[in-house]
Regions:
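A generic "alpha-helical surface" signal
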Residues: 8-12, 62, 120
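Generic detector of well-ordered alpha-helical segments enriched in charged/polar residues
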Residues: 11, 65-69, 156
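A solvent-exposed, acidic/Ser-Thr-rich amphipathic alpha-helical stretch
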Residues: 35-104
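Short helix-to-loop capping/linker segments positioned immediately adjacent to catalytic or ligand/cofactor-binding
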Residues: 17-19, 75-82, 114-116
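Conserved aromatic-histidine-acidic binding/catalytic patches
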Residues: 2-5, 52, 117
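Short, low-complexity N-terminal intrinsically disordered segments enriched in polar/charged residues
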Residues: 1-35
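A beta-strand edge to alpha-helix "cap/lid" segment located at domain peripheries
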Residues: 86-88, 93-159
Length: 159
């Protein structure tokens, strides 16, 4: 595959992920992941050792399933009512590509509306996508919020 075709395949998956999250299709979102994949929202924007530092989220498969369960169940006050989100993904840059792995960095502008209030969150995101047969799956997603080291409101949805 050419770098352009690898980037196109990656962006196709990334846009699908964003749409699934905004539409509340969380079970389908879980299916986009490698079983051993990691979903990370670090506090320190420069951190790379996610498993040994404090993060807003550092979710393996089990924790992603629990997060989705909370979103569907309504049992958590931070998810009731469920926030409506709309995200725009852009500025995709291919950082690495080979036959089994594609690494892409991009920007996300996410609007949340809940209980009569709208909030905006901007982030740099890095996706590590692993080829599994004829499809790509998310191996790691790191969401570096531009205001991650500031006070954040309760985020009751998946970035």
């Amino acid at each position: 595959m050419t770098p352009e075709s690898q980037l196109f395949a990656a962006v196709t998956l990334i846009n699908l992920e964003g749409d699934l999250l905004d539409q509340g299709e969380f079970t389908a979102w879980l299916d986009l992941w490698q079983h051993d994949g990691l979903y990370v929202v670090p506090i320190d924007p420069n951190e790379t050792d996610f498993k040994n530092t404090l993060n807003y989220a550092c979710d393996d498969h089990r924790m992603r399933e629990k997060r989705v369960h909370r979103l569907y169940s309504g049992e958590s006050i931070s998810t009731t009512p469920r926030a409506r989100t709309l995200r725009t993904l852009s500025r995709f840059r291919l950082l690495e590509a080979n036959d089994s792995l594609i690494v892409v960095r991009g920007a996300q502008s996410l609007w949340e509306h809940r209980k009569g209030h709208s909030r905006h969150y901007a982030a740099d995101i890095t996706w590590q996508l692993q080829r599994e047969g004829d499809r790509l799956r998310i191996q790691q997603k790191v969401i570096r919020l531009v205001n991650s080291d500031d006070v954040l409101h309760s985020i009751g949805y998946i970035l």
